[in-house]
């Protein structure tokens, strides 16, 4: 998986720590977005925030880590951004996985900082 990651996908993967499974069957990890995160380049100078597309991508990349399979995003069925994530913040990413059909996964991703919802996304991803 690492060899085929996009630059941002690899950056996101390298920032995932404390991966664990909850009693409810969801998966959680923490992610540190220090100022060296490449997603901040040009987004926005002087006030860097994590781009929304990176937050959606984090859900897919985390699902790959959990499933140990390479995935490609087929669709984003729902997405809501509620609060930006700034340089220096640590986020918690939680995903719920459901195999909709063979090799097609529904991913529900929820990203929070200090308990506050930053983004929620529902995507479908296929095994490559």
Give short role names for the model-derived ranges.
Residues 14-26, 87, 96-128:
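HotDog/MaoC-like acyl-thioester-processing domains
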Residues 8-50:
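Catalytic strand-loop segment that frames the active site of acyl-thioester-processing enzymes
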Residues 60-94, 104:
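Hydrophobic beta-strand-centered segment that forms part of the acyl-chain substrate-binding groove
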Residues 2-4, 84:
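Short boundary/loop segments of OB/S1/cold-shock single-stranded nucleic-acid-binding domains
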Residues 33, 81, 125-127:
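Hydrophobic residues in beta-strands and at strand termini
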Residues 52, 95:
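Residue-level signal for inorganic ion chemistry
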